[in-house]
Curated annotation (Swiss-Prot):
Family of the protein in this entry: Belongs to the UPF0102 family.
SUPFAM superfamilies: Restriction endonuclease-like
Organism: Neisseria meningitidis serogroup C / serotype 2a (strain ATCC 700532 / DSM 15464 / FAM18)
Domain of life: Bacteria
Protein name, as recorded: UPF0102 protein NMC2069
GO molecular function, a single term: nucleic acid binding
Amino acid sequence: MRLNHKQGEAGEDAALAFLQSQGCTLLARNWHCAYGEIDLIVKNGGMILFVEVKYRKNRQFGGAAYSISPSKLLKLQRSVEYYLQQNRLTNVPCRLDAVLIEGSRPPEWIQNITG
């Protein structure tokens, strides 16, 4: 397993533990479709959260938030729409979030990254 892949998995583990500590329940992890991948799908109360996890060793080059490009955001939005259609959840409240992890800092939960 490559080092970056291991770091990514460790970042997802940390993000999931953080979200669970905030009351979220895991529905799916690394969900794939033709449009892309959703790192974590969790339920928080009556809302489904689609979570992009970004890990960086430090804030160099803009940090974790900088790595969510407009094209990545579009892929995420399309993946979310597809997931909702495939699971007949089009009337369920949902949101696209990010959990940013930079080095040893606590995770940062950014809610509604689509604006």
